[in-house]
Every structure is written in structure tokens, then in C-alpha cells.
């Protein structure tokens, strides 16, 4: 009788573990990659240090609207030095950001990039994504 009770207890424990593993996979959701792209001619730098960028998100349609967008200055190692602007994408995944470059930046060593933040949309996990870094041109 003790053997039957142990076997039953073991089966219940195994069933609970399987159910837990299945639930964890369901909660994790389906991951969707995000690629941040610039429109042609973007970003634009002017002589006074103002920079503007426009573009869109290449991702699943459910992940396009209301994504947090950050316009960042990064150094040669990819470390964020400053955040120039923040906004959200529109319903089509388009975004527009602008900001003033810090005056203390050494010429030719830094870049700007745009980052889309991570977001959950229903059963989907919209992963964070970044644009290709664009070198800040030397001041003329």
C-alpha cells in the first residue's frame, strides 16, 4: 500500500511540473524582432549642432504603434553618452525625433542611434531594437 501511495504522489508531482513548464511557455509569449530603420537622407545634422531623424519600425504590425523611441548619442564602445529626445511611434510604426548635440563632444568619435524599447502587445513580446549608428560629422 505504501508503494502505491508513493507512485501516486510521484505521478502527481510529475504532472504538476509538466503543467508548470507549459504555463511558463504560454506566459512568455511569442517574441517578435524589431529593426529600426531611417528614411532616406536621415539623420540630418546642421551647423549649430541640431540633429533630426525620421524613420520606421520593421516588425510585426501589432508591435508598431506606441513604441517608446529614444534618440541617443553613443561613444565608440556603444555606451550611451546622452539621450537627445524621446517619443512614441505612430500607428504605422513611423517616428520622428530631434535634439541638440552636447557641445562638449570630441569631433569624429561619437555617433547617434535610435532605440525602440521593449513592449508587450497581447500575447506578443516586441523586442527592443536599435538603428545602425551614424557618425556625427565634424563641425564645419
What function would you assign to each model-found segment?
Residues 17-25:
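C-terminal segment of classical bacterial N-terminal signal peptides
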Residues 27-48, 139-140:
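Short, compositionally biased P/S/T/A/G/V-rich stretches that sit at domain boundaries
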Residues 49-53:
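Structural beta-strand segments of beta-rich domains
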Residues 54, 94-103:
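Exposed aromatic-hydrophobic patches
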Residues 59-66:
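A short beta-turn/strand-edge loop motif at beta-sheet boundaries
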Residues 80-92, 100-101:
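Solvent-exposed serine/threonine-rich low-complexity stretches and specific carbohydrate-binding patches
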Residues 106-134, 138:
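Enriched for extracellular/lumenal, surface-exposed ectodomains of secreted and cell-surface proteins
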Amino acid at each position: 500500500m505504501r508503494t502505491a501511495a508513493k507512485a501516486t504522489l510521484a505521478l502527481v508531482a510529475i504532472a504538476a511540473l509538466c503543467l508548470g513548464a507549459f504555463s511558463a511557455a504560454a506566459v512568455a509569449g511569442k517574441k517578435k524582432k524589431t529593426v529600426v530603420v531611417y528614411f532616406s537622407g536621415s539623420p540630418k545634422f546642421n551647423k549649430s549642432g541640431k540633429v533630426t531623424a525620421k524613420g520606421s519600425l520593421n516588425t510585426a504590425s501589432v508591435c508598431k504603434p506606441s513604441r517608446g523611441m529614444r534618440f541617443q548619442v553613443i561613444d565608440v564602445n556603444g555606451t550611451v553618452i546622452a539621450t537627445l529626445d524621446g517619443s512614441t511611434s505612430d500607428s504605422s510604426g513611423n517616428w520622428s525625433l530631434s535634439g541638440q548635440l552636447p557641445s562638449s563632444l570630441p569631433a569624429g568619435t561619437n555617433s547617434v542611434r535610435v532605440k525602440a524599447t521593449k513592449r508587450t502587445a497581447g500575447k506578443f513580446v516586441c523586442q527592443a531594437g536599435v538603428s545602425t549608428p551614424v557618425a556625427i560629422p565634424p563641425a564645419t
